[in-house]
């Protein structure tokens, strides 16, 4: 790519509606990137950047040039924490549910994210991006699920399975957010939508299915994720311990 001006960094982060926390993402100003063969964009309300770009790192949305999802993930690495970069990576790697979404393929593969890192080895924040890719997993449906998984693993708990179907009694299949099938422990993160009346009924039925099949269902909310998810870790750890798991 030789001549262009494209929305990038925090602006592209918002355009792509990425999950995760990017410091300053809502600050005034539009981030514009150009190839390093051009002068940096300098005008009121514009935050200019220059860099090396490959043809497949720029796309067009409603007539506006914007850095691709994978390139945007890398460009934001300098300001984001490793865990929040992992949140975005999980989002990009997630396999969609065709019955509920307008796509059938993930936004990126692990190989595509790795290739992006290999292309731009001197990019600020690339070390954090590499660590984020190492701890990214396919299967998380939301940012809280990723943060919960990371907190559990960091606390020394076994790594859970992500959104894997569990066959319960009478052939009923449930797909918990996180699971320890070996110990018959399921973990669900319940966001604000779980307070709605219809969802409460579904949640009760779900819990009955798990308990009837001998599983423990651990229900986690935003409150449990405070203070580095200590309460969430304690709940899951207690459930695993009751099934014979012991920390190393």
Residue ranges: model-predicted function:
Residues 96-248:
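Surface segments flanking catalytic/ligand-binding clefts of nucleic-acid enzymes
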Residues 1-125, 246-248:
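Short gly/ser-rich loop at a beta-strand->alpha-helix junction or flexible surface loop bordering the NTP-binding
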């Amino acid at each position: 790519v030789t001549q262009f001006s494209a929305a990038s960094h925090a602006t592209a982060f918002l355009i792509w509606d990425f999950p995760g926390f990017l410091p300053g993402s809502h600050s005034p100003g539009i981030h514009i990137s150009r190839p390093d063969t051009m002068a940096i964009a300098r005008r009121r309300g514009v935050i200019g950047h220059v860099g090396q770009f490959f043809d497949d790192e720029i796309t067009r949305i409603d007539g506006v040039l914007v850095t691709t999802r994978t390139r945007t993930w890398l460009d934001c690495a300098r300001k984001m924490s490793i865990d929040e970069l992992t949140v975005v990576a999980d989002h990009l790697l997630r396999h969609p549910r065709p019955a509920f979404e307008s796509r059938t393929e993930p936004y990126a593969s692990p190989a595509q994210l790795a290739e992006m890192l290999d292309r731009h080895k001197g990019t600020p924040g690339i070390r954090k991006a590499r660590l984020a890719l190492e701890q990214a997993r396919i299967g998380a449906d939301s940012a809280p699920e990723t943060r919960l998984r990371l907190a559990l693993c960091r606390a020394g708990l076994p790594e859970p399975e992500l959104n894997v179907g569990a066959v319960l009694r009478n052939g009923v299949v449930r797909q918990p957010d996180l699971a320890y099938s070996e110990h018959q422990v399921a973990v669900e993160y319940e966001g604000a939508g779980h307070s709605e009346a219809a969802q409460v009924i579904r949640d009760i039925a779900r819990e009955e299915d798990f308990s009837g099949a001998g599983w423990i269902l651990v229900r986690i909310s935003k409150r449990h994720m405070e203070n580095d998810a200590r309460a969430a870790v304690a709940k899951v750890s207690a459930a695993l311990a009751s099934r014979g798991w012991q920390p190393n």
